[in-house]
Amino acid sequence: MANIKSQIKRNRTNENNRLRNKAVKSELKTLIRLVKRAARDNDLPRAEDALRRASLKLDRAVSKGVIHPNQAANRKSGIAKLVVATRLRNSTAGE
């Protein structure tokens, strides 16, 4: 247990940040999972909508300092590839 007043406050701040970061990361995982599920089911409109929401949330997490910008870029490109593949599957299936 800290005795110094500033360290007590710092511990409290760190705990609040940890909980916020955990919630944001959990929501990111959920949104990415939605994109993957929609892509797997060949549901293009749902996949594109989920991709848009996930990209916004990833950018917001970067601006808040929750994740590194490169990690967000890697995740965005990965789910974007899935949506593009879904778009190609749907366009060739219609022919």
Curated annotation (Swiss-Prot):
Origin: domain of life: Bacteria
GO cellular component: cytosol; small ribosomal subunit
Region (Disordered): 1-22
Gene3D superfamilies in alphabetical order: Ribosomal protein S20 (1.20.58.110)
Coiled-coil blocks: none
BP GO annotations: translation
GO molecular function: small ribosomal subunit rRNA binding; structural constituent of ribosome
UniProt entry tagged with the keyword rRNA-binding: yes
KW Transferase (keyword) present: no
InterPro entries in the record: Ribosomal_bS20 (IPR002583), Ribosomal_bS20_sf (IPR036510)
Entry keyword set: Ribonucleoprotein, Ribosomal protein, RNA-binding, rRNA-binding
Pfam family, one: Ribosomal_S20p
Comp. bias intervals (Basic and acidic residues): 12-22
HAMAP family listed in its UniProt record: Ribosomal_bS20 (MF_00500)
Family membership noted in the UniProt record: Belongs to the bacterial ribosomal protein bS20 family.
Purpose of the protein: Binds directly to 16S ribosomal RNA.
Protein name: Small ribosomal subunit protein bS20
Organism taxonomic ancestry: Bacteria, Bacillati, Actinomycetota, Actinomycetes, Micrococcales
Gene name linked to the record: rpsT
